[in-house]
Amino acid sequence: MTAVLVYFDKGEKAQTQLLLEALKEAAHNRCDGVRVLNGYALADTDRLNMYEYIVVFCAEKPLFTSKPDSAVVTILKEHGLKEGCKGCVLTVSRGLFSDKFTRNVMNALESCGFMIDYFDTLRNAADARRAGANIG
């Protein structure tokens, strides 16, 4: 199974890179290939619907809010996220309302027809390895 891990992090923080490496390493057990893409830097030729599994990783979360950036859903729709695509949603635990933030991201993506089979809130690399083992 081919999978794509689309992450959203404007700051390109070191913690995000650490979590991405742990996710990718653990996902290789169930997936033939995992491609990592920065959601904010997707090219016009990057199409998500060619992958069997799509991981949406929101690595940035405002400290005091539970609303996801509306640009995330818009970017994913523009690059081929359509009804029937299967995948999971991962977010980073930061500040207040982290679980509600995850639910709001899931609701926004499910309204597009994205079928979510797994979700998690990551706190550290161990959480990322556990979540990566469930990709696919």
Question: Where are the model-predicted features located?
Answer:
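FMN-binding flavodoxin-like domain, especially the glycine-rich phosphate-binding loop
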Residues: 2-136
